[in-house]
Amino acid sequence: MQIRGSGPWRMVPRPAAFLRGEGPTRRQGRLARTCVVLALLTGLALACDLATLGPTPESPSSIVPVQTMTPQAPHAECTPARVRLAEVSRWLYLIGADLEAETVQRIVASQYDMVVLDFLPSEENNTDYPMADVVTRLHDAQHPKLVIAYVDVGQAENYRRYWQEAWEIGDPEWIVGEDPDGWEGNYPVAFWYDEWQEIWLGADGILQQILDDGFDGLYLDWIEAYADENVIAMAEQDGVDPVEEMIWWVRSVSDFVKSRCDDCVIIAQNAAELAEYDDYVEAIDAIAQEQVWFDGGADNDPPGDCPLPRSDAEVDTEAYRDSLSEPCRRYFDSDPDSPLHVSSEEYLYYLTLAQRKGILIFTVDYALDPENVSWVYETSRALGFVPFLSTRALDRYIEPVP
């Protein structure tokens, strides 16, 4: 067994119950979040209150922000990467579809400032995909784009080139279970193992290949692996703190990239609560938070338009469940750990905390209904965030919203 060695930099462990969103820590935190949002976020309180109210199922656009806020980060470090990201007002997130010539041309011709794409050459069936040529075309477009590579650093995916035919859960030992949300072929990993990290950080690893193809940075998925129950069990067995190890891991990825490309960006998907740790904040440039207001089910069933509870007080109430459409209610009932059992208020607390520390915020909601889409764009932008909406599978090109 090889585990990444511990260094002099250590963190205060976080209670496991808090990581899982359970127990008295969460209950006591609800009132605290409401108070802190009002007290801490001077200049953002009004917009945050409106966003917490959210769209009602009957009238999603009945409440809209009355003014647009500018994110303020008085203590933020003005790095080249954050300067580049601050210029992004429209972005595309497309990883569930093959990048055929027609799709690439639509992206090239679009007014998007940034696009997040899967690094297709890492897929077993796409090893010859001309990724570098596509990146160059997007850079050279009439409206040039930042091109960011999507990577899953907390799960092994059985369709990637690194996957070996004999691998299964428990062999190698750092593959610890199945995806808890039902995404087939995805397996949470004990990400602190050298064998896993070498796949990414090796001399000919995935990160170097991404940089060689001209990408402008990384979009890190499954940062939340530290909260997966199988990962937690493995961490306890190995005597490590999964939160600490994840921050070490993100810092290692960030250091690798920025030592070779100082203006390349690091965007972390979800896990906004890690913004409480300054060591984590220093390693990333932005957070992209999924389903702040709307979600869809795994495997795109339903594809979206399931509103989250607007406040902590509404979580898991009968009134909230009754307000859902039939497909969304099935999703709610089938997965007690889904985002439909978390409030927009909780997400907004951590996002605004991160924003105050100088982290740029992108939002990813899953909705197609025009009223819901319009409401999210207006609400997210009023908070100083940069929104994007699509299907849960992120499998279609979406035209930019002005």
Indicate where each model-derived feature is located.
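Bacterial N-terminal signal peptides
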Residues: 35-47
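Short hydrophobic transmembrane-like helices used for membrane targeting/insertion
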Residues: 1-3, 11-12, 36-37, 63-69
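Glycan-processing catalytic domains of CAZymes
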Residues: 73-402
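Compositionally biased, low-complexity intrinsically disordered regions
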Residues: 6-7, 58
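Ser/Thr-rich, Proline-interspersed low-complexity disordered segments
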Residues: 48-79
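Bacterial N-terminal signal peptides that target proteins for export
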Residues: 8-12, 24-35
